[in-house]
Amino acid sequence: FSGKKFVNPDLARKVRQAAETLGYSVDRVASQLRSGRARVIAIIVPDLEDVFLGQLVSRLEACAQEAGYEVIVSSSRNDEAVQASRMRAVLGWRPAGIIVVPCLNTVAPDLLGEIGDVPIVGVDRIHPSTVDFDTVTIDNYRSGLQAVDYLAQQGAADVLLAIARRDLHNIQERVRGAQDAAAAKGNIVLDVVAI
């Protein structure tokens, strides 16, 4: 059932048919005994209603499935205490890894100490220089520059930048890039509004 060893295709088909007839499903706990880890990846995001985060989770689920992993998804509801609780809860599953979009700019150091050797990847709302694990981010400063440059090319003189939160590193960098681009142009009035 693991697909890790070659099995005669006819025999594999017969075994799968018998398993289906008997209602057999893989015992995840038993499978975990050999590796010490479940073939589960935990994804923790601040808000499942956020369009970007929803799309991110959907794509990560598809990639995990292609690689033979199941996914547990959880929302921290933009609350650091809930984020910590969710991370501690998924550690009980002994996941193969954790992907986290933190509520703020990092993951609490004491929580990282509890993770042990479980691989973790921080995505989006994270300042890469504040953590000792892999991160996936974009150049937020450059994004802000490019946005204002594009609007200036379209003839805009007044730009309103609507942001969700001022306390997130990625948002601060986008605002800084937009402000620098507006200042460099000299004829752009940039207003930043938190919504």
Locate predicted features.
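N-terminal helix-turn-helix DNA-binding module of bacterial transcription factors
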Residues: F1-R39
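Interdomain hinge and pocket-entrance segments immediately C-terminal to HTH DNA-binding domains
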Residues: V26, S35-E49, C63, A67-Y69
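Short beta-strand elements in bilobed, periplasmic/extracellular small-molecule ligand-binding domains
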Residues: A64-S75, L160-A162, A178-I195
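Flexible loop/hinge segments that line or gate small-molecule binding clefts
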Residues: R77-N78, A96, V100-Q146
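Short, well-structured alpha-helical segments in soluble
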Residues: A81-R94
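Periplasmic-binding protein-like
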Residues: L91-P102, D158-I163
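Hydrophobic alpha-helical segments within soluble ligand-binding/sensing domains
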Residues: D134-L161, A183
